[in-house]
Amino acid sequence: MSSFNKKTSGGFSLLELLIAMVITMALMTAASTLLAQALRVRSRENQKSDALADAQRAINIMSREIANTGFNMMGNGIVAADSGATSLRIRSNLNRYDTLATALSRDSIVDENEDIKYFINEADQTRYLARYDPNGNGKTVLANRIDRMTIHYYDQKVTYTAPPGEYDITNVSAAPVSPENAKYIVISIAVTLDPVGQPGSPGYQPPYSVLLCSDVTLRNTDLWNY
């Protein structure tokens, strides 16, 4: 007499497999969404760091050179006819007392860094903050991705508000003056960050503007109210 051992094999039913696949796909979708968000946030932060570092470096260069305007000259050194809210031209005689310089260099403004103009140059739908030195290297790009630059002229130190996300300062404590009468300058530069992704997509970063400001005292003027 023979006997048979009955073996039962267990497994997943079709319904269980479908449920497992749905859960797996949901987890993969959530993971890909989080990854897309993280990548776009990182892209925006990298863009912000590069743009702000570029603009801050440009502001530092401008502030240092503007502070020395009018050195060994009558007046504040600002060329009023070539200066305004969006551009600034400054002059200084840096070699006036340099015994090693030529007579022409001591008596005239003909050397590098003595006649400088700052302005916004638009090219290929991009705004560049440029520095022009006719006696030096000509035109140099100080920063790109600049949305707006505004230069304010005052005859005394001022206070103001720099609203986040705006393009210029507000609530200034004193009235502006003409460039030739300025003793104190406020430079405001708006840096626009481009959008990352498409509206409605995971991790979308909308366009955003960051306002950077610098206060410059013209050292070669009598800023009695400073």
Where are these regions (language model features)?
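Short, cationic motifs built from Arg/Lys/His that form the positively charged side of catalytic pockets
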Residues: 56, 67, 120, 128-131, ...
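Internal low-complexity, small-residue/proline-rich segments
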Residues: 71-77, 84
